[in-house]
Amino acid sequence: MLFLLYAEDRDLLPVNSDGYDDYALRPKRLEVGDRMGRGDAFSVTASQIWGRIADLSRIVDRGDASIGIPPYNGGLFAPANTPLLDQIRLPDSVLAPVIDKLSFERQGSDRRYINYRDLTVQQLGSIYERLLEHEVVREDGVIAVRPNAFARKNSGSYYTPDELVTLILEKTLEP
């Protein structure tokens, strides 16, 4: 979800296109924030927010020329890489607070919209690296998130600091 928020806030997705509005997360984030601010209840059975996230993930993975999105095919949103997500549907009562916390920073009674545009690639990589240290599992019919010390090792996912990349490039490409 962080990558979708980042892509929208950086205008990497066609957020200014009317055709994209029906699938975008930004309007849903604002709507959820307004409703949370008013103390509205969210359904414990309906999964509209989940549906929006699932639809957008599928569109980004496969592309949809009718709304101006090419297939990205990076594998991040490929259903084969996230089989658990196809087996569940989180209700709005669960996802609304998550969307709200990812979208608004609170300082006392003030709420400030979080714009992911300002994240650097390094910060996004660092967040992703930390997320890789956890795994989502189903335990006795309940979905849980738990630390997994071997998750990054098993997936071969390691973040390489800029300084090391620069050094390797300089030494490798020297005449």
Predicted regions and their residues:
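Preference for the N-terminal adenyl/adenosyl cofactor-binding alpha/beta module
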Residues: M1-P175
